[in-house]
Amino acid sequence: MPLHLPHKLKTYQKNYNISYTEMFGINPKTEKNQIKTFPHHMLPSDLSGVINVCPGAGNCKRTCLHFAGNPAYMKGKNAKRLRQTIAFAADNSLYLETLFLAICRAIYKHQGETIAFRLNATSDIMWENLTFNLSPDVADFAQYKFGIKISAGKYDNILQVFLD
Protein backbone atom coordinates (compact mmCIF):
# COMPACT_ATOMS: atom_id res chain seq x y z
CA MET A 1 0.00 0.00 0.00
CA PRO A 2 1.34 3.44 -0.88
CA LEU A 3 2.24 5.69 2.02
CA HIS A 4 2.36 8.79 -0.14
CA LEU A 5 0.13 10.47 -2.66
CA PRO A 6 0.73 8.89 -6.09
CA HIS A 7 3.36 10.80 -8.07
CA LYS A 8 1.09 11.80 -10.96
CA LEU A 9 -1.47 13.33 -8.57
CA LYS A 10 1.19 14.99 -6.45
CA THR A 11 2.70 16.58 -9.56
CA TYR A 12 -0.72 17.65 -10.85
CA GLN A 13 -1.66 19.24 -7.52
CA LYS A 14 1.70 20.99 -7.31
CA ASN A 15 1.46 22.31 -10.88
CA TYR A 16 -1.95 23.87 -10.24
CA ASN A 17 -1.43 24.72 -6.56
CA ILE A 18 -4.44 22.70 -5.41
CA SER A 19 -4.73 19.97 -2.79
CA TYR A 20 -7.24 17.25 -2.05
CA THR A 21 -7.04 18.40 1.58
CA GLU A 22 -8.41 21.83 0.63
CA MET A 23 -10.91 21.10 -2.16
CA PHE A 24 -13.98 22.04 -0.18
CA GLY A 25 -14.78 25.55 0.89
CA ILE A 26 -16.90 26.99 3.62
CA ASN A 27 -20.25 28.63 3.33
CA PRO A 28 -22.08 30.37 6.18
CA LYS A 29 -25.42 29.07 4.88
CA THR A 30 -24.34 25.43 4.79
CA GLU A 31 -22.71 25.78 8.22
CA LYS A 32 -26.19 26.41 9.62
CA ASN A 33 -27.45 23.07 8.27
CA GLN A 34 -28.04 20.21 10.66
CA ILE A 35 -26.14 18.02 8.22
CA LYS A 36 -22.45 18.84 7.73
CA THR A 37 -22.17 19.96 4.10
CA PHE A 38 -19.00 20.23 2.03
CA PRO A 39 -19.37 22.82 -0.74
CA HIS A 40 -17.09 22.55 -3.77
CA HIS A 41 -16.49 25.88 -5.48
CA MET A 42 -15.12 26.90 -8.82
CA LEU A 43 -14.88 30.32 -10.38
CA PRO A 44 -18.38 30.59 -11.84
CA SER A 45 -19.52 30.97 -15.41
CA ASP A 46 -16.75 32.13 -17.75
CA LEU A 47 -14.89 34.26 -15.19
CA SER A 48 -11.80 32.03 -15.36
CA GLY A 49 -11.21 32.94 -19.00
CA VAL A 50 -10.38 29.27 -19.57
CA ILE A 51 -13.64 27.33 -19.31
CA ASN A 52 -17.29 28.15 -18.75
CA VAL A 53 -18.42 26.01 -15.81
CA CYS A 54 -21.95 27.46 -16.00
CA PRO A 55 -22.84 27.21 -19.69
CA GLY A 56 -26.50 28.03 -19.06
CA ALA A 57 -25.84 31.08 -16.90
CA GLY A 58 -28.21 33.96 -17.47
CA ASN A 59 -29.33 36.46 -14.87
CA CYS A 60 -27.93 34.25 -12.12
CA LYS A 61 -24.43 35.28 -13.24
CA ARG A 62 -24.87 38.69 -11.61
CA THR A 63 -26.35 37.33 -8.37
CA CYS A 64 -24.19 34.23 -8.04
CA LEU A 65 -23.38 32.91 -4.58
CA HIS A 66 -19.72 33.43 -5.49
CA PHE A 67 -20.08 37.18 -4.93
CA ALA A 68 -21.66 36.80 -1.48
CA GLY A 69 -19.74 37.08 1.74
CA ASN A 70 -17.17 39.35 3.27
CA PRO A 71 -15.33 41.40 0.60
CA ALA A 72 -12.13 41.12 2.65
CA TYR A 73 -11.92 37.43 1.66
CA MET A 74 -12.77 37.90 -2.04
CA LYS A 75 -9.16 38.00 -3.30
CA GLY A 76 -8.23 34.69 -1.66
CA LYS A 77 -11.55 33.11 -2.56
CA ASN A 78 -11.13 34.12 -6.21
CA ALA A 79 -7.56 32.82 -6.33
CA LYS A 80 -8.43 29.37 -4.96
CA ARG A 81 -11.48 29.00 -7.16
CA LEU A 82 -9.52 30.10 -10.21
CA ARG A 83 -6.78 27.53 -9.50
CA GLN A 84 -9.37 24.77 -9.13
CA THR A 85 -11.19 25.82 -12.30
CA ILE A 86 -7.98 25.93 -14.33
CA ALA A 87 -6.89 22.55 -12.94
CA PHE A 88 -10.27 21.06 -13.91
CA ALA A 89 -10.03 22.52 -17.43
CA ALA A 90 -6.45 21.25 -17.86
CA ASP A 91 -7.15 17.62 -16.91
CA ASN A 92 -10.54 16.70 -15.58
CA SER A 93 -9.49 13.05 -15.08
CA LEU A 94 -6.81 13.99 -12.56
CA TYR A 95 -9.14 16.61 -11.09
CA LEU A 96 -11.77 13.93 -10.51
CA GLU A 97 -9.21 11.72 -8.76
CA THR A 98 -8.25 14.68 -6.57
CA LEU A 99 -11.93 15.32 -5.81
CA PHE A 100 -12.37 11.61 -5.08
CA LEU A 101 -9.64 11.79 -2.43
CA ALA A 102 -11.19 14.95 -0.96
CA ILE A 103 -14.51 13.13 -0.59
CA CYS A 104 -12.80 10.08 0.94
CA ARG A 105 -10.99 12.33 3.41
CA ALA A 106 -14.23 14.02 4.49
CA ILE A 107 -15.98 10.66 4.91
CA TYR A 108 -13.05 9.39 6.99
CA LYS A 109 -12.91 12.50 9.19
CA HIS A 110 -16.66 12.40 9.84
CA GLN A 111 -17.21 8.68 10.35
CA GLY A 112 -20.56 7.91 11.93
CA GLU A 113 -21.99 11.29 10.91
CA THR A 114 -24.43 12.08 8.14
CA ILE A 115 -22.65 14.39 5.72
CA ALA A 116 -23.42 15.90 2.34
CA PHE A 117 -21.45 17.19 -0.61
CA ARG A 118 -22.48 20.10 -2.80
CA LEU A 119 -20.25 19.70 -5.84
CA ASN A 120 -21.83 22.61 -7.71
CA ALA A 121 -21.78 25.34 -5.09
CA THR A 122 -20.70 27.91 -7.70
CA SER A 123 -20.74 25.96 -10.96
CA ASP A 124 -23.11 23.93 -13.12
CA ILE A 125 -20.84 21.08 -14.12
CA MET A 126 -22.74 17.96 -15.05
CA TRP A 127 -20.68 15.61 -12.89
CA GLU A 128 -23.04 12.77 -13.77
CA ASN A 129 -21.85 13.02 -17.41
CA LEU A 130 -18.10 12.86 -16.69
CA THR A 131 -16.61 9.38 -16.89
CA PHE A 132 -14.45 8.67 -13.84
CA ASN A 133 -11.35 6.50 -14.14
CA LEU A 134 -10.01 5.52 -10.73
CA SER A 135 -6.42 4.38 -11.09
CA PRO A 136 -5.12 1.49 -8.97
CA ASP A 137 -2.53 3.68 -7.23
CA VAL A 138 -5.14 6.26 -6.17
CA ALA A 139 -7.55 3.51 -5.06
CA ASP A 140 -4.76 1.93 -3.00
CA PHE A 141 -3.82 5.30 -1.48
CA ALA A 142 -7.47 5.92 -0.47
CA GLN A 143 -7.64 2.50 1.17
CA TYR A 144 -4.37 2.99 3.05
CA LYS A 145 -4.94 6.61 4.07
CA PHE A 146 -8.68 6.56 4.77
CA GLY A 147 -9.64 2.90 5.05
CA ILE A 148 -12.03 3.26 2.13
CA LYS A 149 -11.88 0.31 -0.22
CA ILE A 150 -13.15 1.14 -3.68
CA SER A 151 -12.13 -0.85 -6.72
CA ALA A 152 -10.02 0.81 -9.35
CA GLY A 153 -11.57 1.02 -12.77
CA LYS A 154 -13.84 2.97 -15.05
CA TYR A 155 -17.08 4.36 -13.62
CA ASP A 156 -19.89 6.18 -15.40
CA ASN A 157 -19.19 9.13 -13.10
CA ILE A 158 -17.72 10.02 -9.71
CA LEU A 159 -21.16 9.85 -8.10
CA GLN A 160 -21.48 6.16 -9.00
CA VAL A 161 -18.44 5.34 -6.88
CA PHE A 162 -20.15 6.51 -3.71
CA LEU A 163 -23.79 5.72 -4.49
CA ASP A 164 -23.52 2.09 -5.60
Language model: regions and residue ranges:
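Class I S-adenosyl-L-methionine
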Residues: 1-164
